[in-house]
Amino acid sequence: MSRLIHLSFVLALLACLTGPISANPIDDDRERLNQLLSNPEPADDAELLRNTQEAIALYKKHASRTLPGHQVELDLDRDIRAFETEHLTVDGLPIQGGVWDLIKRGADKVPDEVKDQAKELAKTTAKVLFNKLTEYLKKKISGEDAEKKDT
């Protein structure tokens, strides 16, 4: 009886291990990048922010594989830090309460024209960063895939 139980556990483990787990994370990242690129004009600001944050996550995953000090990576790192400071989120939602409430109250006194210009600037910044990141990732992911095939 114990052999039967042992065999069933081994079979269950094998079934779990051979399930739909991707063996090549670079292919998964390439697929996610293609999904992001398939929608160049997001429907709304939230989708643009979400896509940019996903591109940043992909960048952080792949940029760590290069030697430090490349100018392209340094520029992207600086742009990402600036973007993340301007778009602070917790679990994908904007921060609420605290100092931000004071800032929001002060923002109520700002003319609508200035708010609209700031919003457009933020969207433009996000789009530029998104485009830079996706171009970098296309080259980076393709390069890693070519290196793997050579070895």
Swiss-Prot record:
It comes from the Eukaryota. Residues 1-23 form the signal peptide. Keywords: Immunity, Innate immunity, Secreted, Signal. It holds the Pfam family Turandot. GO terms for biological process: cellular response to heat; innate immune response; response to bacterium; response to heat; response to oxidative stress; response to UV. Its main location: secreted. InterPro entries: Turandot. It is found in: Secreted. The keyword Kinase does not apply. GO terms for cellular component: extracellular space. The keyword Secreted applies. A humoral factor that may play a role in stress tolerance. Belongs to the Turandot family. This is Protein Turandot Z. It comes from Drosophila pseudoobscura pseudoobscura (Fruit fly). The lineage of its organism: Eukaryota, Metazoa, Ecdysozoa, Arthropoda, Hexapoda. The gene is TotZ.
